[in-house]
Regions:
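Membrane-proximal helix-loop-helix interfaces that form the catalytic/acceptor-binding platform
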Residues: 6-497
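Short, Lys/Arg-rich, polar N-terminal cytosolic tail immediately upstream
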Residues: 1-3
């Protein structure tokens, strides 16, 4: 197979990637994390850092960008997701650039194609969060580091400092990417270790203003709230399934939820991908510098997060790791090329057939993602429409937690009396007062004949029972609607309680 016009092929791949990411961008309802992003972006500039320090577990760059973007494009669903879609498309081009640094044009194009049509990349690219931006910056900083080591220069190192700092200012996982860079430099580019350490001094100085807020996040335990403590939620099989074909099939985990198939079943499902990755790594053993450049971000991130998860210090959701997909894609493409090369004389046809076979897994996932209304949980738009349609003036809205309030009120902006409960599990110490008492319930029943309960995860059976016991004496249920991840109940005050 002749690769005479890689530029034209790359342009076509980027065009396909753009269509996949910008199509139906506002179709799905925002879920809580996106609504939180929008809510932070609607606050005053000077309030963003204190809000993140008090109630978030991420650094501020993506929130500042969202704040600026909302001022330009508004806070509609498509507008909120536009920046992620742009970053996701840019990552396709950067994946090609990285692959070409370490391999051939076919591997570069195939890597870009894998990322371009990946359901996992599409989902992250249509998520108004920081994951797509992190992926772009991880690739850009890696390319900048290679340029620094190969050609040097103050300007190139300065550019690397800015990109590395931006990576860590986007997500704390960015620090693991930069750590992988340091290991690579120390092992394979020892003459450039001193300049890299000097660059890290520059990154540290740029990061210093955020240090007090980072300390507050750690002290407040923002990264491990009550409903995550003691849980083990790092599922390598689900993560690899998402990278391989978008998960969601054969009992594999999805973008939001863990899977139901056991480890043996996961290995069987993922076996073709595992073999291809193994061949990719094996074919690179003669150029371990390139293999390490591509593989270390994956290895360092995996070891660090697995260690923290096994120790039950932190938990991690597979969707957080979408920034590693380009590195996976390069290794997969290298493996496909190696396997196809064994068909002498028919290498091009074999490569096309193998690629189509592996990527065909993702077609039904994309079909469900775009066209199955039940594929994505947390339809807050539908929940708000229900209350808007059936609600009456003066109805009281009772949110079981702040997550429900922020996500629901993104869509439901009509003024209504409301209360957001704080679970007692979120309070520290043994003497934790109940967030909602029977006295409060009776007071509500006297003032508000109708009450809507709007609930979302985390909403444990204990919380349900506590809330039921407070309300059942003064209210009776008259209606309910269950959505994926959302519960909406309508209650009316009993006659005796409303007097």
């Amino acid at each position: 197979m002749k690769w005479r016009a890689p530029g034209a092929a790359l342009a076509g791949i980027i065009a396909v990637a753009a269509v996949l990411r910008f199509s139906l961008l506002g179709q799905n309802s925002l879920w809580f994390d996106e609504a939180w992003m929008a809510w932070i972006g609607q606050q005053r500039w000077q309030d963003i850092v204190p809000l993140l320090a008090a109630g978030d577990a991420h650094p501020p760059l993506s929130y500042f960008l969202m704040k600026a973007w909302i001022g330009i494009a508004g806070d509609g669903e498509s507008a909120l997701r536009f920046l992620s879609a742009c970053c996701s498309v840019l990552s396709v081009a950067l994946t090609y650039a990285l692959a070409r640094r370490v391999s051939t044009a076919p591997v570069g194009l195939l890597s870009a194609f894998v990322v371009g049509v990946s359901p996992f990349a599409v989902m992250a690219g249509q998520d108004a969060r920081m994951y797509a931006l992190l992926g772009t910056l991880a690739l850009a900083s890696t390319l900048a580091l290679v340029a620094c080591c190969e050609r040097g220069g103050v300007l190139r190192w300065g550019g690397y400092v800015l990109l590395a700092a931006a990576t860590i200012y986007t997500h704390y996982f960015g620090g693991l990417v930069i750590l992988a860079h340091g290991i690579w430099v120390a092992w394979y580019e020892r003459p450039h270790l001193a300049p890299w350490l000097l660059a890290m001094g520059g990154v540290a100085s740029l990061y210093l203003p955020w240090a007090p807020s980072l300390w507050h996040q750690i002290a407040n335990e923002n990264g491990w709230p009550w409903y995550r403590r003691g849980a083990f939620v790092l599922h390598p099989g689900d993560l690899l399934g998402l990278m391989a074909f978008g998960g969601s099939l054969f009992g594999m985990g999805s973008y939001f939820f863990p899977g139901t198939v056991g480890p043996a079943g996961q290995v069987l499902i993922l076996l073709p991908f595992l073999v291809t990755l193994w061949r990719g790594a094996a074919s690179w053993m003669s150029d371990r510098r390139s293999l390490a450049l591509v593989g270390l971000p994956f290895v360092v991130t995996g070891v660090a997060t697995a260690s923290a998860s096994f120790a039950r210090v932190l938990i991690f959701y597979p969707r957080w790791f979408s920034f590693l997909l380009p590195f996976y894609a390069v290794l997969l493409a290298r493996g496909l090329e190696d396997i196809a090369g064994r068909w002498q004389g028919r290498r091009g046809e074999a490569l096309a057939l193998l690629t189509a076979g592996l990527l065909a897994f993702g077609v039904p996932v994309l079909d469900r993602y775009y066209f199955d209304p039940g594929f994505r949980p947390y339809p807050w738009r539908a929940a708000a429409d229900l209350v808007r349609r059936e609600g009456r003036p003066g109805d009281f809205l009772l949110f079981v937690n702040g997550s429900a309030e922020i996500a629901f009120t993104y869509y439901f902006r009509e003024p209504h009396p409301s209360l957001a409960l704080t679970p007692v599990e979120a309070a520290e110490g043994a003497d934790r007062d109940p967030a909602f008492t029977g006295i409060q319930a009776r007071a509500l029943a006297k003032r508000y004949r109708r009450l809507w309960i709007i609930a979302t995860v985390p909403f444990t059976p204990d919380q349900m029972e506590r809330l039921r016991s407070r309300l059942e004496q003064v209210y009776q249920a008259v209606g309910a609607r269950i959505y994926p991840g959302i519960w909406v109940h309508l209650l009316e005050a009993r006659r005796a309680a409303s007097r």
